């Protein structure tokens, strides 16, 4: 996995060193970043879409959950979202001072994948462990992948703004895919199938 992913990052480095392959007229590295972000957002929003439903579903029946009250589920959901965005700060510091941005994104993608697959294990005790992995991984990936997009362009390059526009389109596409795929599987086959689909999506993103 690491070798495949580093081949993609090598494409980014080659463009930075003025290899002029393009993606819709933009640096070819934007393709790798676009697809990685798209699948990460698919996994993130797909899991979010079924998270509260899983927590509030009863422990018995054809699609059992954790049987939390609505208040408990909403509190956990809110804490999770808050921690995801808070961890971008230490994730950025680690990338700037220790790992570098590319290694931070790689590590984040792998940790997020582990988190979703941990959620997919049909054991109640793995739920919070899976959330912890996703929080940590997203902190490493989320802010740093945007930084790499900026590195594809010179400071005064007029294409930079449109490059970011293309990149941010991946968020919208990924969120729609997440709600359709993870939400559909979660409600029709079982919540853990939805979590597993999120993990599979992030695994695809890690291979870009």
Task: Describe the residue ranges of each PLM region.
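Symmetry-related core transmembrane helices of the 12-TM Major Facilitator Superfamily/SLC fold
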Residues: 193-208
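Intracellular juxtamembrane helix-capping segments at the cytosolic ends
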Residues: 141-154
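Glycine-rich segments within core transmembrane alpha-helices of 12-TM secondary carriers
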Residues: 162-179, 186, 201
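Central cavity-lining transmembrane alpha-helices of secondary-active solute carriers
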Residues: 78-93
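Short amphipathic helix-loop junctions that connect adjacent transmembrane helices
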Residues: 50-72
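Conserved MFS/SLC helix-loop-helix module at the cytosolic interface between two early adjacent transmembrane helices
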Residues: 89-110
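C-terminal ends and interior cores of transmembrane alpha-helices
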Residues: 110-127
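Hydrophobic core of transmembrane alpha-helices in multi-pass small-molecule transporters
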Residues: 126-141
């Amino acid at each position: 996995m690491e070798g495949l992913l580093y081949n993609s990052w090598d494409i980014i480095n080659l463009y930075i060193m003025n290899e002029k392959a393009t993606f819709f007229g933009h640096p070819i590295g934007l393709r790798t970043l676009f697809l990685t972000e798209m699948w990460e957002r698919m996994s993130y929003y797909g899991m979010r879409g079924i998270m509260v439903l899983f927590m509030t579903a009863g422990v018995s029946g054809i699609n059992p959950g954790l049987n939390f009250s609505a208040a408990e589920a909403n509190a956990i959901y809110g804490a999770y979202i808050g921690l995801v965005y808070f961890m971008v700060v230490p994730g950025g510091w680690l990338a700037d001072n220790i790992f570098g941005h590319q290694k931070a994104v790689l590590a984040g993608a792998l940790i997020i994948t582990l988190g979703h697959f941990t959620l997919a294990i049909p054991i109640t005790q793995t739920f919070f462990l899976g959330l912890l992995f996703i929080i940590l991984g997203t902190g490493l990936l989320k802010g740093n992948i945007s930084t790499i997009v900026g590195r594809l362009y010179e400071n005064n390059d007029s294409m930079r703004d449109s490059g970011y526009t293309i990149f941010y389109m991946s968020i919208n596409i990924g969120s729609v895919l997440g709600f359709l795929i993870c939400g559909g599987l979660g409600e029709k086959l079982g919540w853990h199938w939805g979590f597993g689909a999120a993990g599979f999506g992030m695994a695809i993103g890690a291979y870009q």
